[in-house]
């Protein structure tokens, strides 16, 4: 009798547990159903993953920081200069479309290519949705690619031992755009002129009193095409803030976008030299990421490379490296978005792009880059001479219509980001692979 009661009791507990689990799953499903989706619609992929490419071994006594007055630890090996790669392959690939590699700019990582600060679809999934195998990277020395901490440890150890001058000289200068620096670079101004964040206030382009800018072609009658309203309420209210608060407005200092700004830790890597480049001394940024991009292009058997801002010149250095290896044919296209386009800096010539489609692009708040214009003109001069077949074009979004009004430097995160992506995709459809002009008889 007692055993029967126990069975009944256990059955009751089991039924109660099942009911609790069902309620939990139902609750979670309900919460998920109400969640705002980042993607426009389900994304069908064949494969996705991540890997690292490139890098070299380094033996160092400073993989860790020795304690004060302690002997240096035994040598250890670390790997530096590698690059993190994340990819998605669509289930329905566009016929004959090469993969695209997207490269972020200064102070950013590949996060800026995944989704927008207000929770919308980013360029990477949108390209996949359009049938393009897409690879996004964290520059060597940045984000998930990691940096060389031994440089800082060695400098610290030297300073502790009394060699302050040489130790201090070894400490790298980490560049990082500040929150208000990003604002004044891309979204508006700090007013009045000459003020600091403690004495002046932030103003959007297009707000009343927006001063005329020297370089931008935008009109002061419209606002940046950017999700400036996507803010963190906790930061707006200055919860846990350190030091004195800026003059405001607080919401302009609380953009969710600011959270993805990171130090340019590639400065911990060594630089290099390039005999064909002007100047011949190359920064760490223009040394490692171009090498890794070249390796990635070779691994993929060819790709289009789309760069932004700081990485613009890196894309050109990558082309040079592939040229030196006899693999220029693997570059299926080079796209430079508000970045450097100098052929001389990267050791290239216009003839190197005879069979490589080349596109430069600018938004609404940047002046026309004479450097990019000159490169496009030099390539097209060869077309006028009947040399080469690949298209070269400088697309200025501010000339294409109202949908591009207010396009900022961070256009991949803007409110019109997918319209801009369509411009790139349509250009690629028309020009990659390059088509020889038919000779009229």
Regions found by a protein language model. Give the residues of each.
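Catalytic active-site module of serine/aspartate enzymes centered on a nucleophile-bearing elbow/loop
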Residues: 407-441
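Short, surface-exposed "cap/lid" segments of acyl-processing enzymes
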Residues: 93-95, 100-138, 142-144, 148-153, ...
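Bacterial N-terminal signal peptides
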Residues: 14-26
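The feature captures the conserved acid-bearing segment of alpha/beta-hydrolase catalytic domains
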Residues: 336-397
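Gly/Ala-rich beta-loop-alpha elbow adjacent to hydrolase catalytic centers
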Residues: 306-315
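Conserved alpha/beta-hydrolase fold motif
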Residues: 305-306, 334
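Conserved acidic catalytic loop of the alpha/beta-hydrolase fold
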Residues: 287-303
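N-terminal cap/lid segment of alpha/beta-hydrolase-fold proteins
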Residues: 34-94
């Amino acid at each position: 009798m007692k055993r029967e009661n126990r069975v009944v009791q256990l059955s009751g507990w089991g039924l109660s547990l099942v009911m609790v689990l069902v309620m939990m799953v139902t609750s979670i499903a309900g919460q998920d159903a109400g969640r705002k989706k980042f993607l426009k619609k389900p994304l069908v992929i064949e494969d996705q993953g991540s890997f690292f490419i490139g890098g070299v071994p380094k033996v160092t006594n400073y993989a860790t920081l020795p304690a004060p007055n302690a002997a240096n630890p035994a040598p250890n090996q670390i790997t530096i200069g590698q690059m993190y790669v994340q990819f998605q392959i669509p289930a329905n690939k566009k016929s004959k479309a090469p993969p695209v590699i997207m490269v972020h700019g200064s102070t950013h990582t590949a996060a800026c290519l995944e989704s927008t600060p207000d929770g919308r679809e980013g360029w990477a999934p949108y390209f996949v949705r359009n049938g393009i195998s897409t690879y996004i990277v964290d520059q060597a020395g940045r984000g998930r690619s990691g940096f060389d901490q031994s440089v800082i440890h060695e400098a610290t150890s030297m300073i502790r031992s009394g060699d302050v001058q040489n130790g201090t000289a070894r400490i790298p200068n980490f560049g990082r755009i500040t929150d208000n620096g990003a604002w004044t670079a891309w979204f508006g101004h700090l007013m009045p002129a000459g003020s600091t964040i403690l004495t002046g206030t932030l103003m959007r382009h297009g707000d009343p009193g927006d001063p005329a800018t020297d370089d931008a072609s935008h009109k002061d009658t419209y606002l940046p095409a950017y999700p400036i309203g996507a803010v963190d309420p906790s930061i707006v209210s200055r919860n846990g803030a350190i030091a004195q608060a800026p003059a405001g407005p607080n919401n302009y200092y609380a953009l969710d976008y600011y959270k993805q700004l990171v130090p340019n830790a590639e400065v911990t890597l060594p630089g290099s030299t390039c005999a064909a480049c002007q100047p011949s001394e190359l920064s760490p940024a223009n040394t490692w990421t171009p090498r890794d991009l070249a390796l990635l292009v070779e691994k993929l058997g060819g790709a289009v490379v789309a760069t932004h801002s700081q990485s613009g010149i890196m894309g050109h250095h990558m082309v040079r490296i592939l040229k030196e290896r006899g693999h220029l044919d693997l570059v299926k296209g080079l796209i430079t978005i508000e970045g450097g386009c100098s052929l001389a800096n990267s050791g290239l010539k216009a003839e190197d792009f005879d069979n490589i489609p080349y596109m430069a692009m600018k938004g609404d708040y940047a002046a026309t880059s004479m450097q990019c214009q000159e490169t496009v003109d030099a390539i097209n001069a060869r077309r006028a001479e009947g040399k080469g077949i690949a298209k070269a074009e400088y697309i200025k979004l501010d000339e294409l219509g109202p949908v591009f009004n207010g396009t900022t430097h961070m256009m991949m995160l803007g409110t019109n980001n997918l319209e801009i992506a369509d411009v790139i995709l349509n250009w690629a459809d028309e020009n990659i692979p390059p088509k020889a002009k038919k000779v009229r008889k």
